[in-house]
Each structure stands twice: as structure tokens, then as C-alpha cells.
């Protein structure tokens, strides 16, 4: 599959994954006649990591034997993939993503999310093109931690919840285009798949059993959500989820992107007066059933510090924030109240 793309590949992965699948990957590349350069990912999707990997690719680091690669193959979770995409754009390489967990919708997107060395969210960057190839081995996904699989459901669930809200204002998507009905259809399909198959799929992944339900949710978590969010638009759920990345308690618990976004969904549902109680409660109950965060306790934020929550609300409400993609005014106070309401409802429904 790589031969049409180039002749030498950068293989970016983390050490545990390399030990797990390294021999298989190397043998496959050798059989295909693809030369390769292995680089270990150092743990965070930072601009410094992007530069470090790029320096190795062009041979300007201590690894002077490294020649220019023409394919970037990123193997692992979303952060590895995001760095691989950035390096590929910097050095005019083709992009191949190989997600080993279905924890978010990064694999298909022409975007990367950046953090600093303290794991705090710094922003996102859009690329001029999408990955040339996305390789997903369902058997690898089903043997990965179930928590990652569920986190992917949180990220994918938000795609329709946010698009449904922000399309009312004709909000531009991340690339500056107008969201299409096709994007909305993909987002809604992902949403419907999760509600119908998500609970069964989680149980199957817990048992490392590959079933049609798991296959459907893998597609929803990666392909459908990825195409949907990128061609559509985001709103409060991601604004809150991104800000939670800066909270020490969430960092200490290793909260995943989709888990933080899930609490953002809960808050957005409490923020939007047009959402019926029946619909809101149905989504809360689904998230509780699969194990997505809907309370501060789920986020490791108890006992709650009101000062921390106020800071989250203030930071989310800044001008230009995704939270302003709703057809109504969103303020720091309304965000604060929505998060408090989400926590209360989550506790009541558990």
C-alpha cells in the first residue's frame, strides 16, 4: 500500500508499541521494498516534538545517518498521529496514519492539536491536505484498552451534538468553509451508530471480541466522526474539553480527549435551552452506561474548587471561542452554571 506513495518511510511510534508490533511492521516494509527510519515518540504532541522529529528526518540532529523520507507513517494514538502529520507537512512528505486505538477522530483529519510540555492545550492547526492513507486493524483496536475505545465514543458523539447546534448559525468549519449537508449526514450517522451499538461494542471490547458492533463503532469513532467534525463545525463541548486539559486534576487522572469532551457534551446539553429534557437525559444515560464522564467526580475534580471551575468558564468564554458558535449568547456565568447543572444531573441519574 505504501509503494505508490514513496520509497522511504519515517516510522513514528512509542517504545511500548514498537516492542509489540515492531517486527511485523519492519518485515512488511522490507517485503515491500520500502526503506525506513524509526523514531520514538516522546510522549506529547508539542511543537518541540514536531521539530525534534523533523530534525531527525532531515539529518540535522545527532542521527546524521537519516536521509530525507518521503512518507510519514505515524503509528499509535492521536498525539503520535498529530505529530506525524505536522512533520509530513513541514518536510513535504505523504501522510499515513495507523491508529492502534479508536480513541478520537484524528486519523482521517487534516488537523493537529498541540499541547505544551505540561500537557496543557495550546490550540489546533489545519493542514492543506488529509492523510493519503489511513490503516486500521480492527483486531489491534479490540485488544487495546477499553477505556480508549469508550473515549473515542465521547469524541464521536460530540460531532453531531455540536454540529446540530452550530449549523444554526452557519458557523465556518476549521478550514474556513461552510458545513455541508453531507457532513451533517456523516455526523448523524456516527451518532446513531453509537446509540445503537455502543453499549454492546464496549462489552465486546472488554472481552477482546471482534464483532459487527465493534466494527461499526470503530468506523463511527474514526472515519465518520473525523469527516464529520472536520467538514462541519464545533461548539461548547470541545471548548470545555480542551480547557479541561489544563486542569491539574484531569491531568493527574490521565483523562483522555474524548472523556473531557464527553463532559463538555453534558455541559452543552444543559446550556442549550432548545434541548428537550428527554433528549438530554437520554444522552446522559447513554454516557453513564458506557462509562463516559458526566460529573466532576468522573473527572477527578472532587472536592470541587469553585475557583478552578470559574477559571475554566472564563477561559472558555473568551472572544473567538468555539462556545460562541451557538445561536444564543454564551457567557462565563452561563458556562459555569451549565457545568454545575451537568454535574448535578449526572449524579441524579447515576
Where are each of the predicted segments found?
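Active-site segments that bind and position negatively charged phosphate/pyrophosphate groups
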Residues: 174-292
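A short, small-residue-rich loop immediately preceding and capping a beta-strand
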Residues: 60-100
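Short glycine/serine/threonine-rich phosphate/pyrophosphate-binding segments
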Residues: 19-21, 79-86, 104-108, 233, ...
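Acidic, glycine-rich active-site loops and adjacent beta-strand->loop/helix elements
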Residues: 79, 100-104, 140, 266, ...
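A glycine/threonine-rich phosphate-anchoring loop and its flanking beta-alpha core
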Residues: 89-182
Amino acid at each position: 500500500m505504501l509503494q505508490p506513495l514513496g520509497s522511504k518511510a519515517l516510522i513514528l511510534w512509542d517504545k511500548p508499541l514498537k516492542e509489540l508490533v515492531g517486527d511485523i511492521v519492519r518485515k512488511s516494509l522490507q517485503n515491500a521494498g520500502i526503506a525506513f527510519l524509526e523514531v520514538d515518540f516522546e510522549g506529547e504532541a508539542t511543537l518541540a516534538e514536531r521539530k525534534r522529529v523533523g530534525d531527525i528526518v532531515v539529518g540535522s540532529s545527532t542521527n546524521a545517518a537519516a536521509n530525507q523520507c518521503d512518507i510519514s507513517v505515524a503509528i499509535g494514538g492521536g498525539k503520535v498521529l498529530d505529530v506525524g502529520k505536522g512533520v509530513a507537512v513541514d518536510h513535504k512528505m505523504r501522510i499515513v496514519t495507523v491508529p492502534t486505538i479508536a480513541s478520537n477522530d484524528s486519523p482521517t483529519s487534516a488537523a493537529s492539536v498541540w499541547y505544551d510540555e505540561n500537557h496543557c492545550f495550546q490550540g489546533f492547526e489545519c493542514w492543506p491536505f488529509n492523510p493519503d492513507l489511513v490503516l486500521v486493524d480492527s483486531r489491534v483496536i479490540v485488544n487495546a484498552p477499553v477505556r480508549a475505545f469508550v473515549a473515542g465514543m465521547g469524541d464521536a458523539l460530540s460531532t453531531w451534538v455540536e454540529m446540530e447546534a452550530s449549523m444554526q448559525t452557519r458557523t465556518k468549519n476549521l478550514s474556513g468553509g461552510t458545513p455541508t449537508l453531507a457532513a451533517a449526514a456523516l455526523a448523524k450517522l456516527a451518532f446513531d451508530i453509537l446509540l445503537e451499538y455502543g453499549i454492546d461494542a464496549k462489552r465486546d471490547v472488554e472481552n477482546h471480541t471482534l464483532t459487527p458492533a465493534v466494527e461499526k463503532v470503530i468506523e463511527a469513532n474514526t472515519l465518520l466522526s473525523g469527516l464529520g467534525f472536520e467538514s462541519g463545525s464545533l461548539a461548547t463541548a470541545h471548548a470545555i474539553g480542551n480547557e479541561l486539559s489544563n486542569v491539574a486534576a484531569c491531568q493527574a487522572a490521565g483523562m483522555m480527549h474524548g472523556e473531557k469532551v464527553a463532559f463538555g457534551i453534558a455541559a452543552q446539553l444543559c446550556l442549550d435551552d432548545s434541548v428537550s429534557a428527554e433528549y438530554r437525559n437520554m444522552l446522559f444515560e447513554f454516557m453513564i452506561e458506557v462509562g463516559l464522564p458526566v460529573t466532576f467526580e468522573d473527572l477527578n475534580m472532587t472536592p470541587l474548587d469553585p475557583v478552578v471551575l470559574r477559571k475554566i468558564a472564563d477561559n472558555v468564554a473568551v472572544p473567538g471561542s468555539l462556545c460562541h458558535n451557538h445561536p444564543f449568547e454564551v457567557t462565563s456565568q452561563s458556562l459555569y452554571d451549565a457545568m454545575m447543572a451537568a454535574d448535578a444531573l449526572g449524579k441524579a441519574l447515576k
